[in-house]
Amino acid sequence: IEPLIRAGHTIFGENRVQEAHAKWPELRARYPEIELHLIGPLQRNKVSLALKVFDVIQTIDRLSLAKTVANHINKEKLKTKCFIQVNTGEEPQKSGVGPKDADAFISQCVFDLGLPVVGLMCIPPNDEEASLHFALLRQIADRNNLKELSMGMSADYSIAINFGATYVRIGSGIFGPRSDYHIT
C-alpha cells in the first residue's frame, strides 16, 4: 500500500471494518491525505467503529442501517459521506436496494434521516452485460441529482468509466487476488 501512497494515490477502499481498523490508523497518521471508503457490507453493530475509520460508506443498503448511520453522523457531527448500494440485477444473494425502490429509499435517507448521500454504488451480475447495469445506475443517479457513481471493478472498470463512474474498485487489478486475512 505504501508505494501507492508515495506515488500519489490517496483514495482506498476496504471490504472489512475490523481489518481496516487494524491496518489504517497508523498509515493515516503518516499520510493524513488518505480518504478511506468502505466498499463491503456493514453490520449495524459495527457502524460506530466504521465511522471512526472510514470517510465514505458506499454500502448503505437497507433502512435499518441508514437510520443507525444517520443517527451516529448527526449526533457526532461527522463529515462522513454515504452512497446507496443499488442491487441493479435484483440478485437475491447480493445486498442493495432494488432499482424500483431506489428513488423512494434515497429520498427517505436524505430528507427524512438527514443522511449525507452523495452517490450510488452497484455490482452488476457476473453473467450479464455490465453496461446495462451501469446505465441503469446512472439513470437513477440523474433522477436523484446524485453526482458520484461507484461502479466497475478490475474486469469492467473501463466500461464503467464510459458510463460516468467517478469511483472504480480495482483492488485485485493492482494488488492481485485477495489472500485470506483474519484479525484475531
Give residue spans per PLM region.
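C-terminal helical cap(s) of enzyme catalytic domains, especially alpha/beta-barrels
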Residues: 24-31, 158-184
